[in-house]
Amino acid sequence: MVRVSTSEFRVGLRIEIDGQPYLILQNDFVKPGKGQAFNRIKVKNFLTGRVIERTYKSGESVETADIVERSMRLLYTDQEGATFMDDETFEQEVVFWEKLENIRQWLLEDTIYTLVLYNGDVVAVEPPIFMELSIAETAPGVRGDTASGRVLKPAVTNTGAKIMVPIFIDEGELVKVDTRTGSYESRVSK
């Protein structure tokens, strides 16, 4: 593992603190009028999801976490979890439901996901930032709905995600959804 100095701290950098992998969410460089400069960072634990704050004196160094990202295609889901396959090596990886709870509504077969591995074990699965999903159910848009100021209505996608869509979107239509926020982006033309 490589050691990085506090001057190299950046948002998104993966470091190891007390033997645990962390992701830097926020990095503030503070240079007080008196005393030594320091970095105050906010980090998220990859294994537990817990967010903590740490302070490092300027010039200190920490080790980078042994984290590897692999792009893999979702083959299928079953009672145990989801099975992903690397398109180049055809190697398969089974990820159990405990690690998929926060992205369960974004699981769609034959879609490429990013598997985050720490010391060879899957610690997280990241969906693509944008996904094209079909609307499974939504209330029909009624003429005059916009007069009340309501331009969005609830909808459920084919993956089970609950999103808000414009009133002109009907069941069966393809929409582009931002998986980070769960928000509607645009209608997809066929």
Curated annotation (Swiss-Prot):
One GO MF term attached to the UniProt entry = translation elongation factor activity
From which organism does this entry originate? Chlamydia pneumoniae (Chlamydophila pneumoniae)
State the name under which the record lists this protein. Answer: Elongation factor P 2
Q: Would I find Cytoplasm among this entry's keywords?
A: yes
Which gene is this protein's source? efp2
- A GO biological process held by the record: peptide biosynthetic process
- SUPFAM superfamilies associated with the record: Nucleic acid-binding proteins, Translation proteins SH3-like domain
Which CDD domains does the record cross-reference, listed alphabetically?
S1_EF-P_repeat_1, S1_EF-P_repeat_2
Concerning PANTHER family, the annotation shows: ELONGATION FACTOR P, ELONGATION FACTOR P (EF-P) FAMILY PROTEIN
General function of this protein: Involved in peptide bond synthesis. Stimulates efficient translation and peptide-bond synthesis on native or reconstituted 70S ribosomes in vitro. Probably functions indirectly by altering the affinity of the ribosome for aminoacyl-tRNA, thus increasing their reactivity as acceptors for peptidyl transferase.
Pfam short name (any one): Elong-fact-P_C
Q: Which GO terms describe its cellular component?
A: cytoplasm
Similarity field: Belongs to the elongation factor P family.
According to its UniProt record, where is this protein located?
Cytoplasm
Give the principal location in a single coarse category. cytoplasm
Keywords tagged on the record = Cytoplasm, Elongation factor, Protein biosynthesis
Pathway(s) served: Protein biosynthesis; polypeptide chain elongation
